Regions:
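Cytosolic catalytic domains that perform sulfur/thiol-centered chemistry
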Residues: 1-287
Length: 287
């Protein structure tokens, strides 16, 4: 397996981009910088990376399960933020994997080049770089996304697709939930009543909680070397030799795991969108 280019960029790389200075592995064309949050525009207005737009996960997810919007709705949202398939999207958040969730949805939609600020907003602040306050800048909407959405449907699966994939020999279902969630001690969310986990799933060593997978990060919040996380997965017999479907509660932590596996060069990987939230409402089977 050949490792894919890492999606994570450091704060100084982004600062150089904003100052139009040369960078390693820079975007090949137009690029957009977006802060991703959930009901957090007030935090963005209080201080954000200069030039960043704000996009809320509620714009791309739908009730009642927080699954991704239908394709035409998603297309309209992305166009309104000036995004199209050939754009490079550089995303950051203030924790909780909102940026990873959005980045994965963008890949699914058809944007091939997504970058993630390693350590998010806090890494920008630690570096002592400038911030600006106020509302999001005026964005000129795009008229044509450039490809039909979803251009990569195999990356994000609904429940029926997940069940079909699991019927194929060798497919691994990997829970990116904490051990207390995986073992049925807690659901991990105040809006998910059921405890337990999907039968046959392997635990993805996701210690911590829904806001932070502690053993996937360094002490400063940046991402550990993917090879170190692969070694943790190996302990649970999770490798890229098999097709792998990641899931969590509603897709955010699973999206983070997806990007780790992608950086490792794992070829056949996907996220089950509905996760435990959906599965627990439609089946009686738990482990």
């Amino acid at each position: 397996m050949t490792p894919a280019p890492s999606p994570w960029v450091c704060a100084t790389w982004l600062a150089d981009m904003l100052q139009h200075r040369p960078v390693t592995a820079g975007p090949q064309g137009e690029w957009r910088l977006l802060e991703v949050g959930c009901d957090a525009e007030h935090l963005y207005r209080a201080g954000h990376i200069p030039g960043a737009d704000y996009i809320d996960t509620r714009e791309v997810e739908s009730l009642p399960l927080w699954n991704v919007l239908k394709p035409e709705q998603l297309r309209q949202v992305l166009l309104s933020h000036g995004l199209r398939a050939e754009s490079t999207a550089i995303l950051y958040a203030r924790g909780n994997y909102a940026a990873e969730r959005m980045a994965h949805i963008l890949l699914y939609a058809g944007i091939r080049d997504v970058r993630l600020l390693d350590g998010g907003w806090h890494s920008w602040l630690r570096t002592g770089l400038a911030e600006e306050i106020g509302a999001a800048p005026d964005i000129k909407p795009q008229r044509d996304f450039g490809v039909r959405i979803p251009a990569q449907p195999e990356l994000l699966l609904n429940m029926a697709q997940t069940q079909q994939r699991l019927a194929q020999p060798g497919t691994l279902l990997v829970s990116i939930r904490s051990w207390p969630e995986f073992s049925g001690q807690t659901s991990g969310y105040d809006y998910i009543a059921a405890t337990g986990d999907i039968p046959g799933a392997r635990w993805g060593q996701a210690a911590g909680d829904s806001q932070l997978i502690t053993n996937f990060h360094n002490a400063d919040g940046t991402v550990r070397n993917p090879s170190e996380i692969a070694a943790l997965w190996q302990q649970q017999r999770i490798t890229g030799d098999n097709p792998v479907i990641f899931y969590c509660g509603t897709g955010w932590r699973a999206s983070f795991a997806f990007f780790i596996a992608r950086a490792l060069g794992w070829a056949d990987i996907a996220v089950y969108d509905g996760g435990w939230f959906e599965w627990s409402q439609h089946t009686n089977g738990t482990q």
